[in-house]
Amino acid sequence: MSTLIMGLAIPFIGTAAGSACVFFLRKELSVSLQRALTGFAAGVMVAASIWSLIVPAIEQSQVLGRWAFLPAFLGFWLGILFLLLLDHIIPHLHRNIGQTEGPKSRLTRTAMLVLAVTLHNIPEGMAVGVVYAGLRSGSGEITAGGALALALGIAIQNFPEGAIISMPLCAEGKSTVNSFWLGVLSGAVEPIFGALTILAAALIVPAMPVLLSFAAGAMLYVVVEELIPEMSAGEHSNIGVLLFAVGFSLMMALDVALG
């Protein structure tokens, strides 16, 4: 149980630590640094989706022979459609263009910005939850080291995400303390959805490959819909692509070394 709690808490701690940067760094993050951090986060999420979620989903379905890809295929598309639905029913703000999405709302710009990050933290919590659910179920394709690698990888990419939300809020006039707590709040959904996913998975263990790829599809939706546009916004620069490669390589190394 302690391993499970630690696994769910690690990504949230990453967000909180990143949000705490607002106490030490007084200036808003430069555009180049934001691009770099966003690219890094995208790389980690893509690698985690492949090595920690899609590959185990296919490996768990080998009994289906040539159709072993089907559960992963189905779950992937369900994850994409789930995030697409949330994108359309929850009002939120895209940081890179300042444009709102979802139904019309009287929410403040700050509230919609926090909602945007919160929305995109949901699949990360689900990813950690479903991997730890697989570990609890005794799945041979998921090891304690692999689950820890995913939790650490998401925590690493959550650190810059926490800073990217708290520091601009402070620069816009929010108090340092409020900016910190808003950043922390955006990450609170991760352990919540992680725990909910574990409970759901415990009820439908045979559907584990679908759940794994569902989380992967949801995470990749966030990467393509939000992170890639952010790391490519403004004047042309390769910094986002280079840090994407760094994030991908780091997550791949973590998964292999700890898995």
Model-derived features: positions:
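Intrinsically disordered, metal-sensing/regulatory segments
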Residues: 1-259
